[in-house]
């Protein structure tokens, strides 16, 4: 009997030793990173040609989640329907090349524009200084450093009518 109890105690201890609770694996969560731009005609380079008293403005939001970027933009007070919208590389006050084209359409009211969509590496059209293609990581690095802007173009202002620096 004593031997049986001892044997059961050894088995119980062995079972406890091998069934230690294991820590739960870490859950990988990627928090969304958000950037914004306040669009204003006074930020555009070169300055747009506007009617007296006109002051186009707008907003753009970019949300990074994994390997893609979702965006929303809205502009108002434009001289006409939008013809294009882009993300460019460029410091404040400097014009730069297009790196990502954005979808934009005329809004429901005259002089307004809206755009919404998502882009990934296939939507990146920019080139690095060495001529190689930019990656999404290159675009995000430029956005994080404050060296990108978004603008909306119209037929009256082909270089751009309203612009905002992209900031965190």
Task: Give the location of each predicted region.
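Positively charged n-region of N-terminal signal peptides that target proteins for export
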Residues: 1-4
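Metal-centered catalytic cores of metalloenzymes
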Residues: 16-85, 89-168
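Bacterial N-terminal signal peptides
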Residues: 6-15
């Amino acid at each position: 009997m004593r031997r049986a109890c001892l044997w059961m105690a050894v088995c119980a201890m062995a079972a406890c030793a091998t069934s230690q609770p294991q820590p739960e694996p870490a859950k990988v969560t990627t928090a969304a990173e958000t950037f914004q731009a306040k669009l204003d005609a006074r930020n555009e380079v070169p300055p747009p040609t506007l009617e007296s008293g006109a002051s186009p403005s707008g907003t753009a939001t970019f949300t990074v989640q994994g390997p893609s970027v979702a965006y929303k933009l809205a502009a108002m007070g434009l001289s006409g329907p939008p013809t294009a919208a882009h993300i460019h590389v460029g410091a404040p006050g400097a014009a730069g090349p297009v790196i990502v084209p954005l979808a934009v359409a005329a809004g429901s009211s005259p002089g307004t524009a809206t755009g919404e969509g998502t882009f990934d590496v296939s939507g990146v059209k920019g080139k690095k200084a060495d001529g190689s293609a930019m990656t999404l990581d290159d675009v995000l690095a430029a956005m994080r450093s404050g060296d990108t802007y978004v603008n909306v173009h119209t037929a009256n202002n082909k270089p751009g009518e309203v612009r905002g620096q992209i900031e965190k």
